[in-house]
């Protein structure tokens, strides 16, 4: 033994002094597993080994004791520093590690003092008693693979712990699920070493099932026989031997469906579901339609019950409730039916009359009945090959029937009547379904703008709800579009829609049944058509035609002239057959017409040539000559130089002319003309020497072009103002030799409204006398004569109203009775005085008036003779010359007598 130890000692001694030249030493003779922070060296420069197996020199600094020291802890490359010698051993360090999941895996980290002095070998680590050797991924980082685990993560180097951490903690965010196969699934993260413990109020075989963890440690599944769970459960979950959470579950028995068919005779039927396991000591029973029935245990997913016959049950046999009680738990309730036909759904095949009826036990159906509101029944028979012409039904399968309904079927209920074993009949419950009217696609209609009845085709057009009340169809178009009011119909194949007046080339009319769209059709109004045209005296033009509509705001009339230019007229009024518009301003009287109503344009009518139209049928013709204004339209190409106007045969000289107005002047002294030309109604004739003008249009305006040289008339007067001015109103106040007499005295300086000859003003010559004598409320005669008394107005009387007011002077000193008496005497005497004075003045004024009229008559006779002679020099009419004054003594005497006031007032009109 001693020899062996001696041999080892000699080997170490020889190796150390022959092969290892150590110039550094431990300061405190630290043990190999002691952390070395500093070593002392003899030389200032030493050789050190760095990973990966690279030796380099390090320069040391001298300490205060004069020695050189190598500071291991603060060495900048300690993550690459190897042991100095085999006996100067640096304990490895791991400053930090990233979080490690329970699945483990490769981890990158910093590894200080990673290698030994022998060829720079990497120092191994120990994790959970397993050797792990890190390896470089670069000079600064190492990688090691950590095995799956949970809880503490302790890393050792030899027997020394160099890093103490933990795996990531497990987490279960959602409640574990349990499926019908007995699988308990837990999902989360870091579920390594997850276990459950089941606590139940019912006995179970295994309270600690084993789970199957997936590779990602995110799902673990525990499997149990389904029969093991029923009732209330508490599942305790532990992760890595640490309690995590408890979850509560309740497992009640459930039945979902009946297997097989329940016929009239009843029998044992199997009902499938979940959690239906029965222990030997557990009782089981059931209820069918509220009556107890016997049930037997099957499997955990089935139970068997005895169902009575339909006659024993005594009910309708449809939707009978059934449930099962297992021990202290009762299942849910399901409804089952005997094998009787039952409609479960009805659907229309597209928009046809064919309906698909789905349900159960249809094989025995022999007839069907449609029941509508008011209990109207329609029987539909079973046919091998029903058609739309011969409605009926056929059975496709035990669950499907095809029905061909009549066109006039109304919405309502459907009933099935079936055979039952050949001895009984059974009526199934009513199934309510709606038959919706359907409009035949692609229908379009044309209509005049006045509208009319439209017959809309379709099916099921007899509209009535389930209570027998009418449900009208409604028809709507776009906003502002036409209106169509549906009427009730009876055959089911169509309905009538009354289209209101409208216009437009295309309108989509949508049909609604109970506010639901059932189809549409298109309405197109016929385009407008223009035929003939007429002119009106007011200048408007009327066009006859068809489909002209009633919408002025949507109407456009276009006038197309011969040169192709266009202008729009103004539509005044429009009806379906007649259009009235105003011709556009301009100087072109020949044009064609186009009419646009909405988006439709008419034919081009014409060309038409406008004729001049006289509008006023009684223009003011001055009786003694003067201005005549002729209002009308379309005096195109009429000029002063080429146009002549005569009234009867009296010429009217044109002073101005435009498209709508002609003004002309009749020379005065009509008295010099023969009464043949100036009495009665005379035609107005407008002629032109210009070939481009049209003859005045008079054929349709009877009497509108006749004029009368009427004598003046007085209709009213104004009061005489303080300047002695009076206004006289009337007609035909001519301006030739005009004379006005008021109470026999002339009214001077007359001014006439020459545009209408209906008013004049003049100054009253005896106004001062009226004021002086206060002729208040006294009637005065007014007479007017024109053109040397050839035209004399009927005498008009007016009351003179004084503009002077009097005020009563009041005095004192007399008793009231005396004052009243004196006033009464004065008034009486004044009345007598004024009565005498009035009679005397009246006599004097009458003599003065007669004398004045005689003087005026002599003057008038001289003027008339002079006017007649002057006119005769300038005018001649046919073979007749201007009339000459009668020179006989009796003629002059008769004329003079006729001028006397007493004689003149007896005649309504003066003629020669």
UniProtKB/Swiss-Prot annotation:
Record's keyword terms, sorted: Cell membrane, Glycoprotein, Membrane, Repeat, Signal, Transmembrane, Transmembrane helix
Extracellular side of membrane: 23-815
Name the UniProt record assigns to this protein: Tiger protein E1
InterPro entries (UniProt xref): Dictyostelium_Tiger, Ig-like_fold, Ig_E-set, IPT_dom
Ranges for domain IPT/TIG: 532-609, 612-686, 715-796
Primary localisation category: membrane
Pfam families: TIG
Glycosites: 54, 108, 164, 183, 232, 268, 323, 356, 398, 407, 568, 637, 653, 658, 706, 716, 763, 774, 781, 809
Sequence intervals crossing the membrane: 816-836
Any single GO CC term annotated in Swiss-Prot or TrEMBL for this entry: plasma membrane
Gene from which this protein is expressed: tgrE1
Coiled-coil segments on the chain, per record: none
Cell compartments where the protein resides: Cell membrane
Signal peptide positions (record): 1-22
Keyword set includes Iron-sulfur: no
Cytoplasmic side: 837-912
Membrane topology of this protein: Single-pass type I membrane protein
